[in-house]
């Protein structure tokens, strides 16, 4: 059985032709699905013999909503979603004046090992398929009965470690026949897999690339990001310049501020010199504290000083507004908390004895 959400329009048209059907049926079927009709029997202009073929060959794979947590602070909603194989992922809905934005996952867990991130603590379980990535938007959109207009690939997982499925997702999610979310409203965050940055640049998409930098030197970056042992900052910045030249799109550098690790004035000055002259923007992120490590967030004064120093170097800077702090809204925190709770309850009930 095939998940229809994994199919582009051209792929479904090709399947129709190969199976003795008119290609235009593919357009009709996807039109129904992206309008919210998931049952083949309810697709009124599809002949019954084709409906039967669809039932025998396809399904519309949507995850189950396990839990929804809503912030009392800002209305952010965190969704814990479950797939049929028992794996869990997280998606976060953020409401802004300009529309609804969703942060989605691209993998179950993560292999990158960044020291301050909860989603990587137990490693990568598996990649999400194209349809599983897409389905997060669909199931949340159905739940809130409102359109989602902005997408951030910044949840659990490294998008460029799931490159082919993510690229196909970007094609489908922005297509008129599907969710029709413009590429300029999509941000892809990566810790810096250099060869894939070049490949992505050659696609010449209109998405925003966000690069998780978090340090100005290779030695300091290696302390908190194992990926730095594979690719140096110099290699990453060279790839970023290539991306800028190919796409004419500004890059966002993400910088998680960790107290007494990378938040000093000298760090800010060095980062300013490093990025000076690039078509870029720096997003400062007060680190989310998790119990599995001792990293603490920087003080408000340190964050303000860091920002001011970058601005003095001609760098555009914003400090990320913290959302959903009362519901473990940082990537990986909710999934891990839920799994731990289930394990404790299982032990108490004797299921693991």
Swiss-Prot record:
Residues 96-326 form the Radical SAM core domain. GO terms for molecular function: 4 iron, 4 sulfur cluster binding; metal ion binding; rRNA (adenine(2503)-C2-)-methyltransferase activity; rRNA binding; tRNA (adenine(37)-C2)-methyltransferase activity; tRNA binding. It comes from Clostridium beijerinckii (strain ATCC 51743 / NCIMB 8052) (Clostridium acetobutylicum). Keywords: 4Fe-4S, Cytoplasm, Disulfide bond, Iron, Iron-sulfur, Metal-binding, Methyltransferase, rRNA processing, S-adenosyl-L-methionine, Transferase, tRNA processing. Transmembrane segments: none annotated. The gene is rlmN. The keyword tRNA processing applies. Its EC number is 2.1.1.192. Specifically methylates position 2 of adenine 2503 in 23S rRNA and position 2 of adenine 37 in tRNAs. Reaction proceeds by a ping-pong mechanism involving intermediate methylation of a conserved cysteine residue. It catalyses: adenosine(2503) in 23S rRNA + 2 reduced [2Fe-2S]-[ferredoxin] + 2 S-adenosyl-L-methionine = 2-methyladenosine(2503) in 23S rRNA + 5'-deoxyadenosine + L-methionine + 2 oxidized [2Fe-2S]-[ferredoxin] + S-adenosyl-L-homocysteine; adenosine(37) in tRNA + 2 reduced [2Fe-2S]-[ferredoxin] + 2 S-adenosyl-L-methionine = 2-methyladenosine(37) in tRNA + 5'-deoxyadenosine + L-methionine + 2 oxidized [2Fe-2S]-[ferredoxin] + S-adenosyl-L-homocysteine. Disulfide bonds join 103-331. The lineage of its organism: Bacteria, Bacillati, Bacillota, Clostridia, Eubacteriales. NCBIfam families: rRNA_mod_RlmN. HAMAP family: RNA_methyltr_RlmN. [4Fe-4S] cluster binds at residues 110, 114, 117. GO terms for cellular component: cytoplasm. It is an enzyme of class 2 (transferase). Belongs to the radical SAM superfamily. RlmN family. This is Probable dual-specificity RNA methyltransferase RlmN. Binds 1 [4Fe-4S] cluster. The cluster is coordinated with 3 cysteines and an exchangeable S-adenosyl-L-methionine.
């Amino acid at each position: 059985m095939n998940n229809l959400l994994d199919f582009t329009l051209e792929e479904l048209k090709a399947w129709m032709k190969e199976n003795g059907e008119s290609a235009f049926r593919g357009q009709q079927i996807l039109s129904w699905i992206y309008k919210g009709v998931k049952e083949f029997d309810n697709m009124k202009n599809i002949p019954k013999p084709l409906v039967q073929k669809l039932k025998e060959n396809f399904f519309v794979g949507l995850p189950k909503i396990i839990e929804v947590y809503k912030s009392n602070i800002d209305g952010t909603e965190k969704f814990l979603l479950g797939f049929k194989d028992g794996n869990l992922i997280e998606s976060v809905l953020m409401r802004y004046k300009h529309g609804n934005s969703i942060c989605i996952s691209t993998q179950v867990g993560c292999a990158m090992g960044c020291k301050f991130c909860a989603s990587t603590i137990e490693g990568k379980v598996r990649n999400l398929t194209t349809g599983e990535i897409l389905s997060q938007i669909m199931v949340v959109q159905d739940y809130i009965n409102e359109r989602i207009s902005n997408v951030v690939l910044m949840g659990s997982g490294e998008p460029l470690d799931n490159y082919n499925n993510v690229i196909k997702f970007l094609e489908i999610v922005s297509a008129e026949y599907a969710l029709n979310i413009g590429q300029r409203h999509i941000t892809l965050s990566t810790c810096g897999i250099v060869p894939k940055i070049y490949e992505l640049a050659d696609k010449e998409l209109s998405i925003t690339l966000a690069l998780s930098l978090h340090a100005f030197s290779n030695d300091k970056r290696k302390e908190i990001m194992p990926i730095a042992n594979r690719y140096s900052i110099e290699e990453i910045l060279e790839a970023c310049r290539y991306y800028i030249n190919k796409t004419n799109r500004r890059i966002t550098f993400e910088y998680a501020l960790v107290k007494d690790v990378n938040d000093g004035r000298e760090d800010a000055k060095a980062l300013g010199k490093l990025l000076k002259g690039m078509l870029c923007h720096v997003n400062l992120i007060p680190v989310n504290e998790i119990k599995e490590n001792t990293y603490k967030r920087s003080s408000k004064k340190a964050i303000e000083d860091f920002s001011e120093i970058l601005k003095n170097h001609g760098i555009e800077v914003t400090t990320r507004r913290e959302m959903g702090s009362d519901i473990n809204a940082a990537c990986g925190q909710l999934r891990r908390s839920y799994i731990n709770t289930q394990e404790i309850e299982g032990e108490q009930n004797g299921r693991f004895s």
